[in-house]
């Protein structure tokens, strides 16, 4: 396996002790990745690496580009600031050594196309009339007695929802034709029983099992991984969100064992109130029912255009705890903080007043910088008395669950 020329390593590669010297020639990372590693064993391995680890920080324009792209794919909430910098460094190296003409500027949206066949529709459901169900076999119709025809007409509707009865005579004849006239004796069966069991055990031990020696071959057969060929820049990561963004952009993703990952997860938003789906990952409220009930679901699209959604069995995904509580009384005014309940809800713009703008006028002759000991500290305005902070700093309702128990009988200082 030819090593990749430039490899960007994430924290997962160091935690899993990946042999990066066998994967790539030049290994890059950022300093925040090393600072994330806390365990002693990994830090000891980082102190005596068998290769040169190069630290490089990405340019701000690439960080901005990757951030906007991850918002379009829906993976931005799952990415940390360090993850975005690792993605930006991979994009930067690809632009320096390969180019950006083959990279995508917009992610591919999941398209749901209708098909004539309905493979997801159950065919054999008792009590339901399904038009797409195949007709009963002709053999059973031909061998009917003519006298029973008027009786069958009254119950012809049963043929739509009941499975056709198996023809036992035909099955017995097929078994006799396959088996032949030679029937083994019981004594011979008992004698050969032990030999057959031993043969089966030996066959089970040899084939059908996934071992470290054949796991790469099985992954190649499943078309999930491949041997990297003519790859100059790649990223080694174990984060699914990072893999999805890299593959959507057209960058190369490498597994910990050095294999090239071809497929990753695609996501859509599904409303668990009206069960409608949308591929616009920037939405917060459902476009059909208007509720804040959108959940991210991983999907795969088959060749015939059918959409298969993969739901999580974790009950915490749809945990209704904290959803039933009394809403506060709506308040008006510039500094009112009301919960965001609908998509078209209007909020105050919180613009600075004219007096506040004059304080921050840097071109004024009497302007005093904030670091100066003579700078004014606002303690008399309405926003200061209400302790209104900027919304980007976490203002508003900070408690996630209003029904959570509060601490009582706290001693006051």
From Swiss-Prot:
Pfam families: PIN_6 (PF17146), WRNPLPNID (PF15017), Zn_ribbon_NOB1 (PF08772). Residues 136-148 have a biased composition (Basic and acidic residues). A zinc finger (NOB1) spans 261-333. Signal peptide: none annotated. Zn(2+) binds at residues 271, 274, 286, 289. Residues 116-150, 181-212, 390-413 are annotated as: Disordered. Gene3D superfamilies: 5'-nuclease (3.40.50.1010), Nin one binding (NOB1), Zn-ribbon-like (6.20.210.10). Keywords: Endonuclease, Hydrolase, Metal-binding, Nuclease, Nucleus, Phosphoprotein, Zinc, Zinc-finger. Residues 396-413 have a biased composition (Basic residues). The keyword Ligase does not apply. SUPFAM superfamilies: NOB1 zinc finger-like. One of its GO terms (cellular component) is preribosome, small subunit precursor. Its EC number is 3.1.-.-. GO terms for biological process: maturation of SSU-rRNA. Its main location: nucleus. Residues 181-206 have a biased composition (Acidic residues). The modification Phosphoserine is found at residues 202, 326, 353. One of its GO terms (molecular function) is RNA endonuclease activity. Residues 5-108 form the PINc domain. May play a role in mRNA degradation. Endonuclease required for processing of 20S pre-rRNA precursor and biogenesis of 40S ribosomal subunits. Belongs to the NOB1 family. This is RNA-binding protein NOB1. It comes from Bos taurus (Bovine). The lineage of its organism: Eukaryota, Metazoa, Chordata, Craniata, Vertebrata.
């Amino acid at each position: 396996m030819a090593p990749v020329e430039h490899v960007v390593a994430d924290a997962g590669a160091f935690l899993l002790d990946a042999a990066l010297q066998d994967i790539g020639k030049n290994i890059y990372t950022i300093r925040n990745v090393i600072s994330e590693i806390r365990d002693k064993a990994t830090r000891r391995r980082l102190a005596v690496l068998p290769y040169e680890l190069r630290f490089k920080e990405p340019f701000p324009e690439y960080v901005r580009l990757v951030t906007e792209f991850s918002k379009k794919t829906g993976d931005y909430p799952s990415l940390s600031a360090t993850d975005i910098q690792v993605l930006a460094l991979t994009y930067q190296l690809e632009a320096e050594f390969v180019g950006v003409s083959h990279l995508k500027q917009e992610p591919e949206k999941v398209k749901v196309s209708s098909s004539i066949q309905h493979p997801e529709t159950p065919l054999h459901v008792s009590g339901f009339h399904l038009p797409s169900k195949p007709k009963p076999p002709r053999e059973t119709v031909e061998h009917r007695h003519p006298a029973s025809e008027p009786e069958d007409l009254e119950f012809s509707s049963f043929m739509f929802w009941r499975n056709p009865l198996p023809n036992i005579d035909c099955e017995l004849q097929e078994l006799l034709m396959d088996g032949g006239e030679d029937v083994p004796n019981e004594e011979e069966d008992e004698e050969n029983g032990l030999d057959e069991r031993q043969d089966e055990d030996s066959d089970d031990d040899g084939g059908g099992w996934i071992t470290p020696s054949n796991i790469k071959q099985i992954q190649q057969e499943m078309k999930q991984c491949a041997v990297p060929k003519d790859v100059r820049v790649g990223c080694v990561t174990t984060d699914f969100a990072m893999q999805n963004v890299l593959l959507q952009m057209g960058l190369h993703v490498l597994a910990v064992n050095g294999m090239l990952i071809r497929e990753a997860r695609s996501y859509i938003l599904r409303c668990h109130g009206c069960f409608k789906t949308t591929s616009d990952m920037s939405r917060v409220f459902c476009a059909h029912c208007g509720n804040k009930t959108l959940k991210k679901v991983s999907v795969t699209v088959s060749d015939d255009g059918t959409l298969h959604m993969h739901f999580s069995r974790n009950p915490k995904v749809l945990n209704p705890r904290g959803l039933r509580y009394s809403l506060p009384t709506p308040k008006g005014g510039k500094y009112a903080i009301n919960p965001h309940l609908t998509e078209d809800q209007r909020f105050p713009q919180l613009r600075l007043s004219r007096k506040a703008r004059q304080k921050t006028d840097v071109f004024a002759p009497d302007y005093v910088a904030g670091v100066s000991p003579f700078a004014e500290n606002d303690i008399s305005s309405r926003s200061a008395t209400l302790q209104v902070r900027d919304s980007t700093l976490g203002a508003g309702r900070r408690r996630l669950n209003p029904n959570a128990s509060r601490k009582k009988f706290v001693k006051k200082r």
